A protein has these predicted regions:
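Metalloprotease/metallohydrolase-associated module, dominated by Zn2+-dependent proteases
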Residues: 2-5, 11-23, 28-29, 35, ...
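Short, charged N-terminal helix-start/capping segments
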Residues: 1, 54-63
């Protein structure tokens, strides 16, 4: 694990990180606009070391876990990066990530796959884990890195639930339902 240098406050995505994210999001993200900060977002130590935050289209990792290139990190690091990229995607499509994150009541990271569900049926944190789990299962064949390994043998079910997203990742209809979506 190679960490970012202490004096480097932020960086852009590496070529490897961009390639990794493109496998899931295609052209739905403005990749050059994404920044990864080598510091907490919240002041006064309110953001735990092992907690990244992506409230505004940029990622904020504690310096002890901010890698120089997440695409060369462990499978768990790549899962974490992809979870945070989901929040970048949500933000860039107009979802109020910062506002919804501040009102975390009821935001479980857990998801339950079902043939009758689509990605928009899940809250913003569940979307993060669902898409990151799908990514590590489909592209890394790393079920051990999944947050919900009970779905390790359910790739067809993931693809059913994600069918609209996989076909059109840039459409706002894939964002979480149940909250007013910010207009651009």
């Amino acid at each position: 694990m190679v960490l970012m240098r202490g004096q480097q406050r932020f960086r852009v995505l590496t070529a490897g990180e961009t390639a990794m994210a493109r496998r899931l999001f295609g052209d739905a993200i403005d990749y050059p606009a994404v920044r990864i900060f080598n510091r907490r977002y919240l002041p006064f130590g309110l953001q735990p070391k092992n907690c990244a935050m992506t409230p505004n289209g940029a990622m904020y990792f504690h310096h002890s876990c901010c890698l120089r290139d997440f695409s060369t990190g462990s499978e768990h690091a790549r899962h974490w990066f992809m979870h945070e990229m989901v929040h970048v995607w949500q933000h860039q499509l107009g979802y109020p990530v910062r506002t919804r994150g501040a009102l975390r009541i009821g935001l479980s990271y857990r998801y339950q796959l079902g043939m009758d569900k689509t990605l928009s049926d899940y809250n913003m944190e569940a979307q993060g884990d669902l898409l990151a789990d799908y990514f590590v299962l489909k592209h890394l064949q790393a079920a051990s890195a999944m947050r919900q390994p009970r779905y390790a043998n359910d790739l067809p079910l993931f693809e059913q639930v994600l069918s609209s997203f996989l076909t059109h990742p840039g459409e706002r209809k894939n964002l979480p339902k149940g909250i007013v979506r910010r207009l651009r």
